[in-house]
Amino acid sequence: IKYYNDELNEKYLRKVRGKDIAFIPQSVDFLDPLMKVGKQVVGINGNKERQKEVFKKYNLDDKVAEMYPFQLSGGMARRVLIATAVMNEAKLIIADEPTPGLNLELAMETLNNFREIADSGCGVLLITHDVDLALNVAYRIAVFYSGTIVEIAQVEDFIKGKDALRHPYSKAFIYALPQNKFKELPGYQPYAGNLPKGCLFRDRCSLKT
């Protein structure tokens, strides 16, 4: 993996983590249950004015800073996680499944927040299994199979349908969506600890020879 053309090794990752690169975890349980929200968002830098600015942007009242995580609603907790990530004006935000357990309205609100972050010039890498939600905010989508990218396509290609996509797994993914009646793909993904050589999809591929 490279970041700004430099290999993102362990030493480089320590340098940019939390500064250039921020991470938003899947679970709101990431928040420390014994620490007030404001202190967690401010972190070691202690920039309370920046914290107030970020809270205002994400419609979090000043009094939220004095609350503990258990006092927050699901939507508020998600916004607190986003606020934590943008505190230091990171260049890249990685969000791991940021919408589980949220109703559609809150999920779309969360994704729209990411869209605004991206439009401001920050890179956003959104990890999700929900294609329909991703299609509403992404520019490009990378399709993973057994931990490997098999295709990177423009959102328009997914909207056009399977004929605009190239890899058989991407096409199968579209077939499996609710609007396509959940058409099942026979077979199983290879075990991560025993990956075969060559194409990981070959045993399930409709184009194999």
Predicted features, each with a name:
Residues 2-22, 158-162, 194-196:
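ABC ATPase NBD coupling module
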Residues 27, 33-47:
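Q-loop/switch helix immediately C-terminal to the Walker
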Residues 128-129:
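H-loop/switch region of ABC-family ATPase nucleotide-binding domains
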Residues 134-136:
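A short, surface-exposed alpha-helical micro-motif characterized by mixed small hydrophobic
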